[in-house]
Amino acid sequence: MKILFCIVLILVLLVLFAVWPNKRRDALRAPFVGHNCAHRGYFGKDQRPPENSLPAFAAAAQNGYGIELDVQFTSDRRLVVFHDDTLDRMTPAKGFVHNMDWADFSAQPLAGSNEHPPLFADMLRTVAETNPDTPLIVEIKSRAEYSKTYLEELCRATIAELKAYPGPYCIESFDPRVVGIVRRQAPDILRGQLADSYQSYRKDGTHAVPAFAFSHLFGNFLGRPDFIAWCPAKRNWAVKLNAALGAMMVMWTALPEHDTAKLEAENDAVIFQWYAPKQKYRE
């Protein structure tokens, strides 16, 4: 019985070590608390203006919202703002963003409009000129096959360009490796772990074990995130534990059909899409 108790205790301690968040850093999180942040900029279901376009970011800043956006590399290592791994949903082209160079990528029209995918630097400049106090949540996109060296270069480029932005910003990723790299390269930047429900990971084809690990934040030991960005699904025990331990809770993505008042009450910041909430719901 004593041996069994010791085994259980060790397992519990290992799990706690795996999922534990960073200590609270209230000064860094203050600009985000109570803020509604426009998912990929402020755009409508008709993609007018298109998501992750300069007009969508300018509209969000003009309306006083925070902004969530996505960054990744082109094949020639230009840092661009684009959500999907592939081009076919938002442009006439096909293939992966990381396999196309900037010249070809920048020529692609977004959602049949006259807008084109922007460089991250141009996005930052546009927002700074519109409202320099706009809080930014920057998601660094990743794929399982990306090497440590590639991710380090991607994070380094993102951090370097953010230094020119005058307003508050933080970095998040679904990939715990990215959060860990940000922790090492720029420990003073607020960092967050994105996570989805176990059911969503399984639906997307993720095997059961990694789906459980990702949804239950077992990668937190790499990045010790300041915040958890969680989906509308019910919080599992690991997410609840992080909230109890003081991690800032960010909700993605609130839609018009959700109980948005409830989501605002339960979260420190909300990433929204396709409706017009108040700029801030909590002071």
Give short role names for the model-derived ranges.
Residues 1-283:
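Phosphate-group recognition and catalysis centered on beta-loop-alpha active-site segments
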